[in-house]
Amino acid sequence: MLTSKQRAILRGKANTMDPVFIVGKGEIDETMIQGVKDCLDARELIKLKVLESSMYNAREASVKLAEATGADCVQVIGSKFVLYLQKKKDSSYADLLK
């Protein structure tokens, strides 16, 4: 669980990021969950976008993906949201989040 101060730091880092995943009109299935897990393992902090034609809104998609991957939801704004999952070793954000 992130504190509000840690969440603010991560929001600042995610501000300039482009979305790496897009939630479309299909279900959030195992393939997408595995792709998000792989991306979180590589980057720790990712931004995702939900299309207007999706059956989910950004809040619903963020909750579902955060639960499925074990990540923390950092921010939800409009159709975009940010997820964070700290690496066990060599975390890029560990020093910032102390």
Regions found by a protein language model. Name each.
Residues 1-98:
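Positively charged, polar, low-complexity stretches
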